[in-house]
Every structure is written in C-alpha cells, then in structure tokens.
Design a protein with these regions (language model features):
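Hydrophobic/aromatic residues within the transmembrane alpha-helices of Major Facilitator Superfamily
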Residues: 7, 11-15, 43, 75, ...
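Hydrophobic alpha-helical transmembrane segments of multi-pass membrane transport proteins
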Residues: 8-15, 19, 68-90, 179, ...
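Hydrophobic transmembrane alpha-helices of multi-pass small-molecule transport proteins
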Residues: 124-146, 291-310
Length: 312
C-alpha cells in the first residue's frame, strides 16, 4: 500500500510540471506561475485541515519544543524550485533533470543511513547499495543517454574557449536535489511532531508561498499579468497546486513510516514512468516521443533497484 502511494504521488509531478509550464506561458513568468501553484496548494491543504478539524496554526508550546530546522521545509522547496529555474537555460533540460535526481538519491541514502533529522534508521547494506547503483543506471538509460546522443553533435561544436566551466552550476543541480530530499525528511519529522501530516504540509506550503511571493514582488513580474489572458487559461492548469500539495502531504506522511530513501526512490520511479507514458502517447500537449528500447532496459534497472532498496 505504501509503495503504491509513493509511486502514485511521484507520478503526479510530471503532470504538475506540464500544467505549470502552461501557466508560465500564460502569465509570462515562471515565478508568477509558481506563486499560483503554491497559493492554490496552500488553500487546498487549508480546506482539508479545516474539514478534518486540524488547526492551521501551531500552539506556542509546540513551537517551543520543535527544533528550528523543522520549519525549513518550505524554504528548501523554494530553493529547489528556484535552482531548477536558474539551471535550465544554463545546463539544458538533460542535466537539469539528471543532476537533481542524483542529488536526491545520494542525500536520501545518507539520511536513512545516519538517521538524520530523527528519521527511520536504515543502514546502507550491500544489497541496498547495489539497488542504488541499479537505480542510477536506470535513470541514466531513461533520461540521460537518449537525449545525450541527440545533442552530441551540438556539444562537440563547443570549444573550450567559448564554453566556460559549468562545474559550479552542475554542483548546484546536485545540491538542489539534496535539498529536496532533505525537505521530505524535515516535513516528515514536523508531521510527527504535530501528530498531523496535513498540518505539516500546510505549514511547509505556506512558507513556500510567502517566499515565492517575496520573489514575485521583488522582480515585479506581476506587472506583466493580464487578467484577460488569465481568464482564458484552461481550468485544469490550476490543478498543479493540488498535485504539488498532495505530493508534499503524502511524503510527509510516508517518510516516518518507510524512510526518506524509500519515499524519494518511489517518487522518482513514479515520476520517470509517468513522464515516459506522457511522451509515449503525447499527453497534456507534449510532443509524442515513442519509448526507446534502451529506456525499457532502464525501467527494468529501476525496478531491480527498488526491490534491492525496499526488500533489504
């Protein structure tokens, strides 16, 4: 049951990304599109909390006994989002996808192995290590290799004189992924402290919304907003916030139960499989890209990796 839930919430992320991309084209700003997503997600979580009788605000007693870092989930989510926005035009789509994924896998294993942030302690056994290697191979076969082969000619045209080092940006991509895994662990701990995953998710999303709002006000992208275009936007694009909120809530619920590494692993597998399905059938306005044989091999490596990590 937990495994299926982890896969399911991961599969929502590519759909959320497609909806956010559509909204970004309408409002002409990635930050403004993110603000809509965060705000709608926060509202959705607030309604769920009210319906369940869960308080939106925490008491002073709970605030005092909860470590300060437990409230960093929203900040980490915001930093991860901002990093992806900044990295895309510099590194391209392939590295912007693969580097954060590697960062997430690495950090989730470290969190589990050392029990960081009071998470479930799951030492890295030899079988789990092999599972991690299998996951990385699967990700490379599915995401990196097909795009790399297509872009090889363009990359070969770049010379050292005209191609500045991108090492720091690549390192930023890995760190961004590590922050996202840390967010899962922190939100899971906060949910445990509050005895409510929905309240933890609401607090995280509220902080994220505030931070995105600060960025939007600073860059003044709201001046480009045209209400006439916003009214013409397909209603489904507003579901992006709902999907994002569901992802954060489910991760906060699952992390204390099965460990951060398992949550991140299942989410990534669900995310990749969902992306392949979208490309295969050209769903959500995506260009139709039939699954390649090498990607099928990659999926097999993914499932072997999941079995190695989850069963041992």
């Amino acid at each position: 049951m937990y495994l299926l839930l982890g896969l399911f919430v991961g599969s929502l992320l590519p759909i959320q990304t497609a909806f956010n991309s559509k909204m970004r084209g309408i409002v002409q700003s990635p930050f403004l599109a993110s603000l809509f997503s965060f705000a709608i997600g926060t509202l959705f979580l607030a309604l769920i909390a009210i319906f369940q009788g869960v308080p939106l605000l925490i008491t002073s007693d709970v605030f005092a006994r909860t470590p300060w870092w437990a409230y960093l989930g929203g900040l980490l989510g915001m930093l991860g989002l901002t990093a992806n926005i900044l990295l895309f035009p510099i590194l391209g789509s392939v590295q912007t996808v693969i580097l954060p994924i590697l960062g997430q896998l690495l950090m989730s294993i470290l969190i589990d192995h050392f029990g960081l942030f009071h998470t479930l302690l799951r030492p890295l056994s030899f079988i789990r290590f092999l599972g991690l290697i299998s996951l990385i191979v699967g990700v490379l076969l599915i995401v990196f290799l097909p795009s790399y082969l297509q872009q090889k000619r363009q990359l070969m045209k770049e010379t050292k004189e005209h191609a500045p080092s991108k090492f720091l940006w690549q390192l930023t991509g890995i760190i961004a992924g590590m922050l996202m895994s840390t967010q899962v662990a922190i939100n899971g701990f906060l949910g445990k402290q509050l005895h409510s995953s929905i309240q933890a998710a609401f607090i995280s999303f509220s902080i994220g919304t505030f931070l995105v709002l600060v960025v939007v006000l600073s860059e003044k992208s709201y001046r480009k907003l045209q209400l006439s275009l916003l009214k013409q936007a397909p209603k489904y694009v507003y579901l992006a916030g709902f999907f994002g909120a569901s992802y954060v809530f489910c991760n906060a619920y699952l992390a204390p139960l099965i460990g951060t590494g398992a949550v991140v692993t299942l989410s990534l597998v669900g995310q990749i499989i969902s992306s392949l399905v979208i490309d295969q059938f050209g769903l959500l306005g995506a260009i139709k890209k039939p699954i390649k044989f090498i990607q099928v091999i990659g999926i097999i490596f993914l499932f072997i990796g999941v079995l190695g990590i989850e069963l041992y």
